[in-house]
Amino acid sequence: MEYEYPIDLDWSNEEMISVINFFNHVEKYYESGVTAGDFMGAYKRFKEIVPAKAEEKQIFNTFEKSSGYNSYKAVQDVKTHSEEQRVTAKK
């Protein structure tokens, strides 16, 4: 599916790619499953770019409106698994 990713035009190209990569991991979590370590690595990089909780919440809400995927719930679920575990959304 195609979504509009919440991108800040003040970010560098590398930062934009990293944020999109994180949201790709959120998509995989909901669609086919993702390794917890890979997901959390992408989230850690996302947090380097977006360290403020308020901004993170705003970006997550924008992505959820576009995709229907709740990034916050994905992060909270993946955090409860070991790095090598494959995690997918509960249906």
Swiss-Prot record:
InterPro entries, per the entry: BH2638-like_sf, UPF0223
Bilayer-spanning residue ranges: none
Superkingdom of origin organism: Bacteria
NCBIfam families documented for this protein: PRK04387.1
Similarity field: Belongs to the UPF0223 family.
UniProt-recorded name of the protein: UPF0223 protein SAOUHSC_01044
UniProt organism field: Staphylococcus aureus (strain NCTC 8325 / PS 47)
